[in-house]
């Protein structure tokens, strides 16, 4: 950066999104049948993942990117201690985890559920191999950790987060390949760009891909009647 001073990677100076790195647009070609119909148009430049970086960003090594992101990250919310029981002069404290998941992250998730390509993907994944309720809850958790404004999350972020969740939770590599099969079919040319954007998202999350069972429950408890929580893989015979 020209000034030599590190800035938080997701702090925007204006309501306009950054145009440094634009995520590819996923569109549906209705004339092509089968699950490979959606594809990512290679012509437009990918939209920003929220990283305000110089134009030479893509030429930096992964180590340099990690070091710069480490300097630019905003402080994480700190855990607090609350009184659990009080008996006479004795007091028992319980550590309360500071959750980074906000209502706006649920709103961004719900907005993307209305996207026609996302809806088609969820309907296509009949066996819930890559979109059961736990993996979808992890998408919300990842949205909270990436640090973007809710309006910045686009269709590609949903698939990037779902890929990371599957990579974290599934031993089988096949479910992740299902995402590629749906988005690109047999076209392999777009996969390197997908992995580049995946790496950017992973860095913005500080590599925190594990989501605790408590956080899973908290995310689902925000709207327990939401239809996505009925996507339970264990109930499929």
Swiss-Prot record:
Entry GO MF terms: protein kinase binding
Superkingdom classification of source: Eukaryota
Region annotation (Disordered) ranges: 1-61
Tissue specificity of this protein: Predominantly expressed in testis.
Protein family membership: Belongs to the Speedy/Ringo family.
Record-given protein name: Speedy protein E4
Organism, scientific name: Homo sapiens
């Amino acid at each position: 950066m020209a000034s030599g001073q590190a800035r938080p990677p997701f702090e925007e100076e204006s309501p306009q999104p950054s145009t440094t790195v634009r995520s590819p647009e996923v569109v549906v070609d209705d004339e092509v049948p089968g699950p490979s119909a959606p594809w990512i148009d290679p012509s437009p430049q990918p939209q920003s993942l929220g990283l305000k970086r110089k134009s030479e960003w893509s030429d930096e090594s992964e180590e340099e990117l990690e070091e710069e992101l480490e300097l630019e990250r905003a402080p994480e919310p700190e855990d607090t201690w609350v009184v659990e029981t009080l008996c006479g002069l004795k007091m028992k404290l319980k550590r309360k985890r500071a959750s980074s998941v906000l209502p706006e992250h649920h709103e961004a998730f719900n907005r993307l559920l209305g996207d026609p390509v996302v809806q088609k993907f969820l309907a296509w994944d009949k066996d819930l191999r890559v979109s059961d309720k736990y993996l979808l809850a992890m998408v919300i958790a990842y949205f909270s950790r990436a640090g973007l404004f809710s309006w910045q999350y686009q269709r590609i972020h949903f698939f990037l987060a779902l890929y990371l969740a599957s990579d974290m939770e599934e031993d089988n590599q096949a479910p992740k390949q299902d995402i590629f099969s749906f988005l690109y079919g047999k076209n392999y040319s777009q996969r390197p760009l997908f992995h580049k954007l995946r790496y950017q998202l992973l860095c913005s999350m500080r590599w925190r891909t594990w989501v605790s069972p408590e956080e899973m429950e908290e995310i689902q408890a925000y709207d327990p009647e939401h239809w996505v929580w009925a996507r339970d893989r264990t109930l499929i015979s």
